Amino acid sequence: MAYRELKQKHRALREVFHTNLSLRTHRALSWLDRAEQSAGDLDAQFIFLWIAFNAAYATDIDEQYRSTEKGMFESFFKKLVDLDSEDRLYHLVWAEFSSSIRVLLDNQYIFQPFWDSHNGKVPEDEWKQRFQLSKRKAANALGNRDTVQVLSVVFRRIYTLRNQIIHGGSTWSSQANRSQLNDCTALLFKVIPVLIDLMMDHPEQLWGDAFYPFLADD
């Protein structure tokens, strides 16, 4: 499932959607479309796909919670997995991407405490302990086929990669991060269309106010 099919569905159903859901999916689809048009530029595809994800999931929350954005992933994915009667996300995690997910979870370069230690914010032994703990938790989630927890951990790692690129911590088309960028982009290309489709299949759910609502000109 790709942009064209999802956009046709959006056009057919948007009149019955709540304004917030219609806006979220419209924005997310626009960035998915741009990612599909950026074949050959992996960095651009990753950026556009992350914006598509953010457009779909982000909510306007109190200022005190904005520093804990990563903690929001779990509740979002739990909602989607609970609504996924065809187990599409389960299939993606366990049948299509299980190998690359294990590689991502073992990659220290997309584990934020590693960089915090490198920048002198935490001791080296602390990041290593946290990395081992994170891997044990991830291994437990993998062993239990806990789709929600695995997706949440993976997206926290993707979020670190997103920070590296968006905040200028990476060179365009650099060979230094190609492996994780390839894996993350491939995963996003499959997960994002499914989550947009699930949201459109369940307009009765409360998806929350758009973080930046559309304001018509006076």
Which positions does each model-derived feature cover?
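Short, hydrophobic/amphipathic alpha-helical patches that form generic packing surfaces
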Residues: 30-37, 47-58, 157
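Helix-loop junctions and short alpha-helical segments
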Residues: 1-20, 49-141
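Non-catalytic, well-ordered alpha-helical scaffold segments
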Residues: 29, 43-50, 74, 98, ...
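Polyanionic, low-complexity intrinsically disordered segments
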Residues: 4-15, 19, 117-218
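Short secondary-structure junctions and interdomain/linker hinges
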Residues: 39-42, 59, 87, 111, ...
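Short, surface-exposed loop/turn segments at secondary-structure junctions
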Residues: 39, 64-67, 172-178
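Short amphipathic alpha-helical segments and their helix-coil junctions
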Residues: 22-40, 138
